[in-house]
Amino acid sequence: MHCHVKTWGAIHQKSVKSTSVNSALYVLYNVLGKRRGEVNAMEKLIITACICGAEVTKEHNPAVPYTVEEIAKEAKSAYDAGASIIHLHVREDDGTPTQSKERFEACINAIKEVCPDVIIQPSTGGAVGMSNEERLAPTTLRPEMATLDCGTCNFGGDEIFVNTENMIIDFANTMNEYGIKPEIEVFDKGMVDMAIRLHKKGYIKAPMHFDFVMGVNGGISGEPRDLLFMANSIPAGSTWTVSGVGRFEYPMVTMGILMGGHV
């Protein structure tokens, strides 16, 4: 579940070619201390855009889209700027977060009308307090991807984003049934360990794709050492993307690119 834009950029599956970037990649991967195959600086950078989140309102930022038309417009803008994946939360016209299958279907259809080859990744995090059934509703549309949150997090005050082990297994089984590729959303190292444990039990299939969400209240911070630690904690053959909350967004995105990850 996100309340922020994962990333914006002017690269649409473009290669990283800069000599300075290549040098930084070499240094960073040696700092990691664990080589996972040869570093290929020509791998494509995949950009994911979260265009509205579940909590941010127009009072916070007038550009936050609510209506189907606004969401499709922002998705097209992100796609034109370089996004290959749209991480999708949806709202009612008044801005109320919803996991309605019908609302997701309307938004997905509208997005596909203007950018047919973009990958749609609905959130199954929804908003704090939603039931499992509500959160899973968009998976019945069989999108290409969906988020799989792998642990519980204290978001602040009395808000707890609940994801028990049995819930995670239920969500993973649903995604397997519908042929959906999960983006494994992790807010701290313990959630990485949970995902690996469930992979070993057969609930999450390889190759695993992680999203390191850095700087969430109650989760791991968004300092360079934190991203190095997270990236060095996932199994060989996995892919990862990184997003930072608030002030951590640009530092984490920059470092993620230098490390050969996605954003």
Language-model region placement:
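Alpha-helix-loop-beta-strand connector modules within alpha/beta enzyme cores
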Residues: 97-122, 171-175, 230-236
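Catalytic alpha/beta core domains of metabolic enzymes, predominantly
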Residues: 145-263
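Short hydrophobic alpha-helical segments enriched in small aliphatic residues
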Residues: 3-5, 13-27, 31
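Active-site mouth loops of central-metabolism enzymes
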Residues: 54-70, 124-130, 157-161, 219, ...
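Short beta-strand segments at enzyme active-site cores
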Residues: 49, 83-93, 120-124, 184-185
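Glycine-rich, proline-tolerant flexible connector loops at the mouths of alpha/beta enzymes
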Residues: 59, 85-105, 213-214
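N-terminal small/glycine-rich loop or linker at the start of catalytic domains
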Residues: 41-63, 147-154
